[in-house]
Amino acid sequence: MPEAVIVSTARSPIGRAFKGSLKDLRPDDLTATIIQAALAKVPELDPRDIDDLMLGCGLPGGEQGNNLGRVVAVQMGMDHLPGCTITRYCSSSLQTSRMALHAIKAGEGDVFISAGVETVSRFVKGNSDSLPDTHNPLFAEAEARTAAVAEQEGSTWHDPREDGLIPDAYIAMGQTAENLARWKGVTRQEMDEFGVRSQNLAEEAIKNGFWEREITPVTLPDGSVVAKDDGPRAGVSMEGVAGLKPVFRPDGMVTAANCCPLNDGAAAVVIMSDTKARELGLTPLARIVSTGVSGLSPEIMGLGPVEASQQALRRAGLTIEDIDLVEINEAFAAQVIPSYRDLGIDLDKLNVNGGAIAVGHPFGMTGARITGTLINSLQFHDKQFGLETMCVGGGQGMAMVIERLS
């Protein structure tokens, strides 16, 4: 059975939504630029040999609608290339990599593009979740319960299933973070410390040249060039973040300093069979060892990385001790902290260059972005095995184990 190997990655800088550096770029234009950058790194590959373009997008509507994956293929002049658009919210472009893995293992193709995009700035044109009066009335009581809890002080999370009630499938991510923090006993100070850690590590990694290794500069409509992420800030300290007000509840613990911002960005990964890579004389960057996906209550979705990672590790025949570097998407410190603790991850192996709290989290981009970052990190720090994982809106988790090959 063939192995699935990664031969190229590319990503854009990550912009702040609505006010940042990429706010004037369309998602299709940005995605095409980044896919072309990834393909340019493997000139040996004939584009006509690509079997499918699978594009992850968290909210595929508005400018991100019309099956964006196929739009991008045509935009790049590849009418022969099929294209699909996949949403699994925050893990959309890890899902597309998983689909490439499965297709290669099944012998149904040799070369796939797994890409991801989210341009939240362009949501002013609409998105797939913003249409009015579309929620199922079945969840009305659960939504009202979420709203009531958000206004109360001192509320702790209780699984509604234990009372014969349905959980809130539409719950806002910030409310799930507050629920999880209380349920798992995470404090505001711990969350702030983790947020500061992310910014400080990103600041150090920028100085060391780590982040610039993976960023493809992007040209804006006005001709200016963006070559770095908007999010990282120098000199962030506990004193500086301590006074920030909570975002989601009067007595909340989630602040702008301990969760990710809203962002714009795109990333791409070129995945092929090891037999095709050998045929082309390519040395792969990494091998996809295994993946995992899990579900749990939507109201505590942030704990999703735990079971998903355990699945992926079991399928890889590895333990967490075998993993050299771990990337957990930093949607909220409130969920990364209990996830890494439950998994038994050494903090010295976790998000060692900073994470999404600093660099950002464009939903559909994140899976492919973290794959590229993890490969970059395994090379930069000379390590072998990496684990990528994230929580997923709606109460899910996803994970992938990779092995560095070059």
Regions found by a protein language model. Give the residues of each.
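Beta-strand segments within the central parallel beta-sheet cores of soluble alpha/beta enzyme folds
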Residues: 47-55, 84-88, 112-116, 190-197, ...
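Flexible glycine-/small-residue-enriched beta->alpha junction loops
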Residues: 111-179
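Condensing-enzyme catalytic core mediating Claisen C-C bond formation in acyl metabolism
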Residues: 1-27, 149-156, 163, 238-303, ...
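Active-site pocket-lining segment
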Residues: 55, 175-178, 216, 221, ...
